[in-house]
């Protein structure tokens, strides 16, 4: 199934009040209170010499078109000195024994009977694909060279074939599923513990911070051919594989920029009242060598560049900067390896008016990418 990486959100947009707040940082202490109505003070708050003292969020209004209500995500990084280097993609289906071992772990995770005949065949590009498919229950496992997917029928409906639409819907408004609601069969905290435990059993290193989505009766099906009265209530966790405490890029990577096809770089683990119902493993990589260790720019420099750009080039449509995130981006080279470099990614929303017989406002989810060492912007085609 094709993964849709570019998300268009349809929401009514309103600017958020910019009253001063206090921010709690990773060690549990409180960062200095900042006058959040003052853009210059916001920049100063992001120019901390110690990366662990950065606030978790900043707010201000820049002008009548541009506001900031931004998370500051440094993930598990502990220093402004960050490595770059080369990595090689792990081939899940290259070694038959390792492939079967992974299949057994996935079968155990979603409680499938693995004592069946496993089919294998070659894809068009020559890579081996291993399939376990129960035609009666419609549960399945598929292991390809660059990814693996295990899903029960209920999990496939809840996560893939619904309005949540992890893969299908270009208008998937995932934010409405980011709630504090607790489902009856398990608390969100217990569900997260199970997700973290499962990632460890699969030997996948992920950042401590996860994204949780709660799917309930609002998560209706988007395909009429599926006939069911009720969707199972489901917790869905997006977990971010990392290297040196920094996740692989979470933005929809551009093939013209990176040299390889778009991929979503998050591990998806979903669970309903029966247990884990959906498990999607993204491409993973082995670190081959370190080519550079350098000091990255502070987020204040990146935010300043982004604000200057948005003020200069964007003349219509309200804009809200929502996140500044330190991530690793991969660039394909000629030797079946990838150059991996630290980047700052700025995520923002922009309102766009769609005119016609029934005009409406469309909220676009956009992003810009900057070299974390130099501040040079990578041009996204």
Positions of predicted regions on the chain:
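Segments that shape or occlude catalytic/ligand-binding pockets
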Residues: 178, 193-355
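A short, surface-exposed beta-strand/turn
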Residues: 141-166, 248-281, 354-381
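Activation/maturation switch segments at domain boundaries
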Residues: 24-29, 328-381
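Intrinsic-disorder/low-complexity peptide segments enriched for small residues
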Residues: 7-9, 13, 110, 129, ...
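Short, exposed beta-strand "edge-strand" segments with a Pro/Gly-rich flavor and a Y/T-containing core
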Residues: 65, 81-92, 287-304, 318, ...
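Sec-dependent N-terminal signal peptides of Gram-positive bacterial secreted proteins and lipoproteins
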Residues: 1-24
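Preferential activation on post-signal-peptide N-terminal prodomains/segments
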Residues: 18-258
């Amino acid at each position: 199934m094709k993964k849709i990486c570019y998300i268009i959100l349809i929401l009514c947009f309103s600017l958020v009040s910019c009253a001063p707040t206090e921010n709690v940082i990773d060690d549990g202490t409180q960062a200095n209170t900042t006058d959040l109505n003052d853009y210059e003070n916001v920049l100063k708050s992001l120019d901390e010499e110690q990366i662990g003292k950065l606030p978790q969020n900043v707010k201000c209004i820049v002008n009548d078109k541009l506001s900031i209500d931004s998370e500051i995500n440094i993930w598990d990084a502990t220093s402004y000195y960050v490595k770059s280097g080369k990595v090689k993609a792990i081939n899940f289906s290259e070694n038959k024994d390792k492939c079967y071992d992974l299949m057994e772990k996935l079968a155990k995770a979603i409680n499938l009977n693995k004592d069946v005949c496993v089919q294998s065949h070659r894809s068009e590009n020559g890579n081996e694909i291993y399939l376990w498919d129960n035609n009666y229950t419609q549960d399945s496992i598929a292991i390809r060279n660059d990814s693996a997917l295990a899903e029960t029928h209920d999990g496939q409906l809840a996560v893939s074939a619904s309005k949540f639409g992890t893969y299908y819907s270009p208008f998937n408004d995932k934010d409405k599923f980011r709630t504090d609601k607790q489902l009856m069969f398990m608390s969100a905290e217990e569900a997260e513990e199970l997700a973290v435990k499962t990632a460890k059993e699969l030997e996948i290193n992920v950042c401590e911070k996860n994204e949780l989505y709660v799917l309930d009766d609002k998560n209706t099906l988007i395909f009429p051919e599926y006939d069911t009265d009720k969707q199972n209530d489901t917790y869905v966790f997006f977990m971010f594989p990392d290297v040196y405490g920094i996740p692989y890029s979470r933005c929809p990577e551009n093939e013209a920029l990176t040299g390889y096809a778009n991929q979503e770089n998050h591990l998806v683990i979903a669970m309903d009242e029966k247990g884990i119902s959906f498990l999607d493993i993204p491409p993973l990589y082995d670190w081959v060598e370190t080519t550079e260790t350098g000091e990255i720019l502070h987020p204040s420099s990146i935010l300043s560049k982004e604000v200057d750009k948005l003020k200069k080039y964007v003349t219509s449509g309200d804009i809200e900067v929502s996140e500044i995130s330190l991530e690793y981006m991969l660039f394909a080279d000629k030797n079946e390896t990838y150059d991996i470099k630290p980047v700052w990614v700025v995520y923002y929303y922009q309102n766009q008016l769609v005119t016609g017989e029934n005009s409406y406002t469309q909220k676009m989810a956009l992003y810009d990418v900057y070299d974390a060492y130099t501040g040079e912007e990578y041009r996204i085609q």
